[in-house]
């Protein structure tokens, strides 16, 4: 009888603890809404530490550009694997907490659509949110950024991958990358897992062109990096998809490796704790890590300059529009420099190709560009556009046993249009 009583007391204490832990405090009358459950699929090879597989396209990095690239490659018919070191897809939009991506429009019309827009639109609609009116030119550029529910977005991205036949490998990252006669051998490591992947094409969407660096191809880097941002909410409840949250600059934030990323996160969290104590407010929400703006960029077959960007140059091999002010963040803050009315920059396919390379393409903020051009190109909608183009180019190259830059541009453009993307055209 005594043992039974102790067990009941322990159970009650545990439930009470759970009630108090939901927002870090006790709330009168709070209960757990339901105790529903699901069962994860039992993996046949779960006890095997080593996995060997062959795919057409390996996407490294499931962030803003990477998950779009993977979905596109899968939809194009390529056998696709995406490797992501974190626990979810979406990158800046989800893990980074910048759940107000942009810009999909310019000067009264939509200029970036496709898979990225499909995900953003569905996440807003599923959350009962409101989409901006792109026919209206806002006074400030950020007014047409789209508020999304970051949690819904991450789940929808996984669903789209599953529907496209894309395999996801979380908590893994390449350890070695070796060139082969018909592509690459990539050895990835995760906890309890060693995965050897034979692939025809690699899409490097790591943000800092980590795979490009691993294979010895040239990268560009500034002595001073733009600060990262750590997002959090003090004093009032954060409503995903409804409001913006507080931002803390983490100067020197560097995503180059686990040590530099750890330092950025420790620095950011320490500063947030100091702010909580100073303001005597409750910490209601905090993202799991710093959002990084700048590390490495590739040296590509084309380098997009700030003059290319601000003049709205339409490259002969343009595969996506981009639209955002020149937006360089420094220790003194940021002063966006808006583009002249009617100007819409473009992104060239050759700016996604590391110089002198074959069978590898990048997507995202590591696009080949000078620093000022990159400060506008690195934003989410543009990265999604790059991701979709990289997915098309890599999958078509794999199918033809070719390399992305040798795929006929009309084929890339046709496939992009087929999947809803807006392809730049010359006036």
Task: For each feature predicted by the language model, list its residue ranges.
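N-terminal export leaders
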Residues: 14-31
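N-terminal Rossmann-fold NAD(P) dinucleotide-binding loop
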Residues: 66
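N-terminal secretory signal peptides
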Residues: 1-16, 39
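Conserved beta-strand-loop-beta-strand element in the redox core of flavoprotein oxidoreductases
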Residues: 178-196
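Flavin (FAD/FMN)-binding glycine-rich loop and adjacent Rossmann-like elements that form
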Residues: 92-93, 154, 171, 190-201, ...
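Conserved N-terminal/central alpha/beta ligand/cofactor-binding core
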Residues: 22, 72, 78-79, 85-176, ...
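A short, basic/flexible loop-to-alpha-helix module at the beginning of a structural domain
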Residues: 41-54
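Beta1/beta-strand and adjacent pyrophosphate-binding region of the FAD-binding site
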Residues: 51-63
């Amino acid at each position: 009888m005594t043992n039974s009583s102790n067990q009941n007391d322990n159970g009650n204490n545990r439930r009470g603890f759970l009630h108090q832990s939901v927002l870090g405090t006790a709330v009168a009358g709070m209960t757990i809404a339901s105790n529903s459950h699901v069962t994860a699929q039992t993996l046949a090879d779960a006890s095997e530490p080593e996995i060997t597989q062959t795919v057409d396209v390996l996407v490294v990095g499931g962030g803003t550009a990477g998950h779009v690239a993977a979905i596109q490659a899968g939809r194009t018919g390529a056998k696709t694997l995406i490797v992501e070191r974190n626990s979810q897809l979406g990158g800046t939009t989800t893990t980074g907490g910048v759940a107000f991506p942009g810009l999909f429009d310019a000067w009264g019309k939509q200029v970036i659509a496709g898979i990225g827009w499909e995900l953003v639109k569905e996440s807003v609609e599923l959350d009962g949110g409101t989409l901006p009116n792109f026919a209206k030119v806002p006074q400030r550029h950020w007014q047409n950024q789209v508020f999304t529910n970051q949690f819904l977005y991450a789940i929808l991205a996984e669903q789209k991958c599953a529907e496209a036949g894309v395999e996801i490998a979380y908590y893994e990252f390449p350890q070695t990358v070796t060139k082969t006669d018909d592509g690459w051998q990539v050895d990835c490591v995760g906890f309890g897992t060693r995965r050897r992947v034979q692939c025809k094409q690699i899409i490097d969407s790591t943000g800092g062109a980590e795979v490009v660096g691993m294979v010895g191809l040239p990268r560009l880097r500034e002595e001073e990096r733009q600060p990262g941002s750590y997002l959090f909410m003090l004093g009032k409840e954060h409503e995903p998809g409804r409001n913006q949250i507080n931002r803390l600059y983490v100067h020197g934030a560097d995503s180059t490796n686990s040590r530099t990323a750890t330092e950025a996160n420790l620095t950011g969290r320490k500063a947030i704790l100091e702010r909580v104590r100073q303001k005597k407010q409750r910490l209601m929400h905090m993202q799991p890590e710093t959002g990084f703006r700048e590390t490495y960029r590739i040296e590509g077959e084309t380098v997009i300059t700030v003059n290319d960007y601000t003049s709205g140059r339409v490259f002969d091999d343009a595969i996506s529009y981009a639209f955002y002010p020149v937006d360089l963040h420094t220790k003194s803050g940021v002063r966006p420099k808006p583009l002249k009315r009617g100007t819409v920059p473009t992104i060239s396919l050759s700016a996604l190709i590391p110089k002198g390379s074959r069978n590898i393409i990048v997507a995202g903020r590591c696009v080949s560009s000078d620093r000022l051009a990159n400060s506008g190109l690195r934003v989410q909608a543009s990265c999604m556009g790059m991701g979709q183009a990289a997915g098309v180019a890599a999958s078509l190259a794999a199918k033809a046993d070719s390399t992305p830059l040798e795929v006929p541009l009309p084929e890339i453009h046709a496939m992009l249009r087929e999947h809803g993307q807006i392809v730049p055209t010359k006036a």
